[in-house]
Amino acid sequence: MIAGINIFAAIRIGLAGLTCSIYLYGCTTVKKPRGVDMKLSVFSAAYALSAYTLAFINQFMWMDAVICLPLVIKGIDNIRSKKGGILYIAALSYTIISNFYIGYMVCLFSVVYFAGCVIGERIPRGQLLEKIWRFLLYSLIAGAISAVYTVPVYY
């Protein structure tokens, strides 16, 4: 039984590292390597083995947000670059469904991250309003998808 729990925890930590490496590989600040890049592996392992992850290693319900957070960030970057919002909708709705409290915190982080990214860009007002509208629309869709599960729990 204990070995199974440890294997399950190792799989979850590995998934957190995998999603972080997926985000970092697509990030514009990290150069795409021709082979295996050690920076990608080091930062993915550092994210997966962070103090938060290790502190809650035996409480599996908190780990879903750690796994999905890089995908939510990548989804926000996709929304900003007009690549679509399917990844953002799927990752955010799964995060909210898997754990309401941490999902709520990820939603707050998403707003702060999006605002920080948009403030850092110098774009015309029309494009700014379009990006904000798309972010709000995709966030509401993710909230509506997760509401199918969360609303009956509250009432």
Where are these regions (language model features)?
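Membrane-embedded transmembrane-helix bundle of lipid-linked glycan/lipid transferases
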Residues: 1-155
